[in-house]
Structure formats: structure tokens, C-alpha cells
């Protein structure tokens, strides 16, 4: 995720937590606050109860990638804070994780395009011939 799309300073995280509106799912909590007009900035939080550093970093990387794929379809002008609540995020299929994030973003009315299914990180041409859908 590009530097311009990240919350980086503790004061930025604090402002979003204090002034934002919260949406929850079984795996994540999304806090949304008005931000800069020219884009969307995202922050990711994992607590120690999620596991040791390796597990926390892996959970953060997976959620960050799922959000990065959705950035072009998000409404600009907001700061988003994703708090990872469950260790299931680490082992869950990526498509389920992405569907959970889409559900939260829809609750917050932040998707500009109606998404019918999660964005796939794999292009259809990179799949084996027998797994490709017919045109």
C-alpha cells in the first residue's frame, strides 16, 4: 500500500478512534472518520491477544492486501482504521476475508461501485485451463 494511503502517526490513529464511527464484524472492527479530501488513508491495528509478532504481522499483511485491492472503489475523503479482532483472520480463505471487509465497507457506505463479488488477486489467465470459467 502506498505511503499516501496509510495512517502513520499515533496522533492520526488517535483522531480516527476518537472522532470516527465504528462498524464491526466477527473478525474486524472498522472505524471511519472524515479525512483529507484527495484520498483514503488506512491504518491497521492488531492486539497482543492475537498471538505473537509473527501472527500479528501476518494478519496485518493479509488485511492490508485485501484493502489495497479495494482502494480504487472506495469513496475519497475518509480515514479508515481496521482493528483485527480474531486470530481466524490468519487462516481464513482470502476470499472470505475480502468479503468480510466488503461487508464492513458497505455498512459504512464507502464503496463507490456496487461490488457483486470480491476482487480476485489472481487473474483468470493465471489459473490452470481446467479451473477457468467458460467465456
From Swiss-Prot:
PROSITE patterns cross-referenced by the UniProt entry: RIBONUCLEASE_P
Biased composition, Polar residues: where in the chain? 122-135
- GO terms for biological process, alphabetical: tRNA 5'-leader removal
Cysteine disulfide partners in this protein: none
Question: What keywords are assigned to this protein?
Answer: Endonuclease, Hydrolase, Nuclease, RNA-binding, tRNA processing
E.C. numbers: 3.1.26.5
- A Pfam entry, by short name: Ribonuclease_P
Query: What molecular function does GO assign, one term?
Result: ribonuclease P activity
Return the InterPro entries for the record.
Ribosomal_Su5_D2-typ_SF, Ribsml_uS5_D2-typ_fold_subgr, RNase_P, RNase_P_CS
The question of whether RNA-binding is a record keyword is answered with yes
Q: Which reaction does it catalyse?
A: Endonucleolytic cleavage of RNA, removing 5'-extranucleotides from tRNA precursor
Mind naming one GO cellular-component term on file for this protein? ribonuclease P complex
Q: Where is this region: Disordered?
A: 115-135
- The keyword RNA-binding belongs to this UniProt entry's keyword annotation: yes
The family line of this record is: Belongs to the RnpA family.
- Function in brief: RNaseP catalyzes the removal of the 5'-leader sequence from pre-tRNA to produce the mature 5'-terminus. It can also cleave other RNA substrates such as 4.5S RNA. The protein component plays an auxiliary but essential role in vivo by binding to the 5'-leader sequence and broadening the substrate specificity of the ribozyme.
Subunit notes for this chain? Consists of a catalytic RNA component (M1 or rnpB) and a protein subunit.
Query: What is the protein name given in its UniProt record?
Result: Ribonuclease P protein component
Q: Which organism is it from?
A: Chloroflexus aggregans (strain MD-66 / DSM 9485)
